[in-house]
């Protein structure tokens, strides 16, 4: 029996469900390692349990998140992904079928074709926001995202001109849509995608050491907050944009609900 077309939101649920395949003939699996730090740790734990406790041999492949990953799982080229943030995976709505449940509460019902299966969640709750150093928040008097425009010059660079700069969600394939969110909220900042989590964090660390103001997309839990004193600007809660008005053809300008794009829940 081959475990295929399967994705786990987070590892613990994956391991528990995988245990039911204990009599499987095929003992080799291919795992997609997420391209962010937490995902790498998640996969290390999952693979260790599969190999040391269940006798599988697991080949790990670093695979960028996004639609391509889901398609590879659906095609059987990859057996499972160790971790996925569901509200950042736009392909899930067409590939998964069934409820997404957190703490006994149904957050979303997928109505896709079922080519990718969600095995469950581990109970880890993630939160994404835009963060600034506490020293900048206190010196500039920034208490929420609504205060950012008043001080955008402090966050501007030669490349952004008069606009402030956001060290954005670094990978386009993560589908964060930071520039769309900034524009919908009227925040006059430019989202700068640096390509990797490491690059974005390195630039933030350098700015912190220089005691410069900067705005950073990041998520919790993350090791960065244990090393540096940061404050979230408190982005608004998730709202679903009207699919008839919030379109690529319309340059994603009209959300229909005056909210931010459907890419981040308070709980993820």
List PLM regions with ranges.
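Short helix-initiation/N-cap motifs at beta->coil->alpha
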Residues: 36-37, 57-71, 192-203
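Short, polar/charged alpha-helical segment
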Residues: 37-56, 180-182
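Short, well-ordered beta-strand elements
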Residues: 26-38, 56-62, 163-167
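Flexible, solvent-exposed loop/hinge segments that line or gate ligand/substrate-binding clefts
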Residues: 87, 97-117, 181-185, 191-268
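Bacterial N-terminal signal peptides
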Residues: 9-19
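Bacterial N-terminal signal peptides that target proteins for export
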Residues: 1-11
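A conserved helix-loop-strand patch within extracytoplasmic ligand-binding domains
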Residues: 106-166
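N-terminal segment of the mature folded domain
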Residues: 66-131
């Amino acid at each position: 029996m081959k475990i295929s077309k399967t994705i786990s939101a987070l590892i613990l649920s994956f391991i528990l469900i995988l245990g039911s395949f204990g009599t499987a003939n095929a003992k080799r699996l291919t795992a997609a390692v997420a391209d962010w730090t937490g995902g790498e740790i998640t996969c290390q734990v999952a693979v260790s349990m599969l190999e040391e406790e269940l006798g599988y041999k697991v080949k790990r492949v670093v695979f960028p998140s996004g639609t391509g990953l889901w398609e590879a799982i659906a095609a059987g080229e990859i057996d499972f992904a160790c971790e996925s943030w569901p509200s950042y995976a736009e392909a899930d709505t067409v590939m998964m079928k069934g409820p997404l449940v957190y703490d006994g509460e149904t957050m979303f019902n997928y109505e896709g074709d079922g080519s990718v299966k969600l095995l469950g969640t581990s109970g880890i709750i993630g939160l994404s926001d835009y963060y600034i150093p506490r020293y900048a928040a206190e010196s500039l008097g920034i208490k929420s995202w609504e205060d950012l425009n008043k001080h955008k010059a402090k966050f501007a660079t030669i490349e952004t001109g008069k606009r402030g700069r956001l060290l954005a969600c670094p990978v386009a394939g993560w589908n964060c849509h930071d520039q769309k969110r900034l524009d919908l909220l009227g925040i006059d900042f430019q989202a700068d995608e640096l390509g990797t989590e490491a690059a974005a964090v390195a630039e933030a660390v350098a700015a912190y050491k220089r005691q410069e103001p900067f705005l950073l997309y990041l998520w919790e839990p993350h090791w960065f907050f244990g090393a540096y004193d940061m404050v979230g600007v408190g982005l608004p809660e998730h709202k679903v944009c009207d699919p008839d008005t919030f379109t690529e053809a319309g340059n994603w300008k009209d959300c229909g609900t005056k909210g931010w794009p459907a890419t981040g829940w308070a709980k993820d």
